[in-house]
Curated annotation (Swiss-Prot):
Pathway: Nucleotide-sugar biosynthesis; CMP-3-deoxy-D-manno-octulosonate biosynthesis; CMP-3-deoxy-D-manno-octulosonate from 3-deoxy-D-manno-octulosonate and CTP: step 1/1; Bacterial outer membrane biogenesis; lipopolysaccharide biosynthesis. This is 3-deoxy-manno-octulosonate cytidylyltransferase. GO terms for cellular component: cytosol. It comes from Polaromonas naphthalenivorans (strain CJ2). Coiled coil: none annotated. The gene is kdsB.
Length: 260
């Protein structure tokens, strides 16, 4: 299996300014993400940065980078430019690891790439894990996904799906022998040819309604393969509180990667 990990990194962040460079026990966050990705089976790991400050910090730790434009409207556009700068071919596979996931499990990166490699009918792949708590199922910030028999995504939603007609608002999976609902995990693998096309596709009405970019792919008829992991990934960093939590985990030398 051959694939490249791309980590988009931009300094602008409304909730946490200069987030990629946030210090986590002496190491910039984006560097910690790259160090985790380097433990995967990826042929190479590259940070797609929007400024020289990120590139200089990464270089100090031996992390490969490419400099992308600052005016990209989405992370997908930045990744597509990075693929061109790296000379990747249309049939190559890239895994998009978010730059705010410093505890990403390297085995999960491999699993998502492997899932796409095994599904030539799919343009991209992602991951999901089971939901146990009703509060998570009902939380619109927890994105749910429903699959077909081959673990291909049918739909992603902020709504509680699938909905049990006779057990609305309840933890229906605790009644009888029913499979648990699935929470989407925000890691993606793409075939490079599709990634180059994706930013040019018109936004889908459902994408705009749910504010979920992956619905654009489904709307335009592309398939998304889904790897089901047994455990939730490590915490990401969106707020100062998240950052402090990750710092404590690293300082305490906690177990940083759940098994896939």
């Amino acid at each position: 299996m051959s694939f490249t990990v791309l980590i988009p990194a931009r300094l602008a962040s409304s909730r946490l300014p200069n987030k990629p460079l946030a210090d986590i026990n002496g190491v910039p966050m984006v560097v910690r993400v790259a160090q985790r990705a380097l433990q995967s089976s990826a042929l190479r790991t590259v940070v797609a940065a929007d400024g020289t400050e990120i590139i200089e910090k990464c270089a100090a730790f031996g992390i490969q980078t490419v400099l992308t434009r600052v005016d990209h409207p989405s992370g997908s556009d930045r990744l597509a430019e990075a693929c061109g700068l790296l000379g990747l071919l249309d049939d190559d596979i890239v895994v998009n690891v978010q730059g705010d996931e410093p505890l990403i499990n390297p085995a999960l990166i491999d699993a998502v790439a492997r899932q796409l490699e095994a599904r030539p009918d799919c343009a991209m792949s992602t991951a999901a894990h089971s939901i146990d708590e009703l509060a998570d199922f009902l939380n619109p910030n927890v994105v749910k996904v429903v699959l077909d028999a081959r673990q291909t995504a049918l739909y992603f939603s902020r709504a509680p799906i699938p909905a049990a007609r006779d057990l609305a608002g309840q933890a229906w999976w605790k009644h009888g022998n029913l499979p648990k609902p699935l929470r989407h995990v925000g890691i993606y693998a793409y075939r490079v040819g599709f990634l180059r096309q994706f930013p040019q596709l018109p936004q889908a009405p459902l994408e705009q309604l749910e504010s979920l970019e992956q619905l654009r792919a489904l709307w335009h008829g592309y398939r998304i393969a889904v790897h089901i992991t047994e455990h939730a990934p490590g915490p990401g960093v969106d707020t100062p509180e998240d950052l402090e939590r990750v710092r404590r985990l690293v300082a305490n030398d906690a177990h940083l990667a759940d098994p896939v």
